[in-house]
């Protein structure tokens, strides 16, 4: 139709808030299946600021998925017990916009590695980074790619990483069945299949409603230990 819809919708969601299926469920797969929406999901304060400002400047509808577990509701500590506080540069994004540049649609390699690639987004970026540190003590170096934007997602950055490492894990917090991670994995396989040394893996939450119980919620979503085991299995010789 050609009509502009300059609207940004912020949706708080995600685990570690003990709010059950009403607020903790990850719904990105619902939204990515609706053509025409731009979907962003920051993993840190700087990206949260930049992506929100850039979304506001677009003539298209943007869904901005903000993870409640990263808010720092517990004295500046996330639901995973970490501090991701940082001084946010409010000028850089404006300079990019003035130059016609944008972070939307561009993934970022947040950790370099040569043995395996983890592609992920949102709060799972921090789980991936912790798992990567775990296995680095055993001589395995993992590259972590933060998508930042789900639609359009930066397939090129992901493919280039997998062409280098030869192994792929896609990590999502949402339930495994029907998750967006399968779309990401399929797209990468189309271009990098012959370079894969092991079958690619999609890690997601158990196929169950998000429990209110802290113990049960922690059991259903991907943990550092689960991701570490998958890395070690993929890199076993």
What is each stretch, according to the model?
Residues 1-58, 235:
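Conserved thiamine diphosphate
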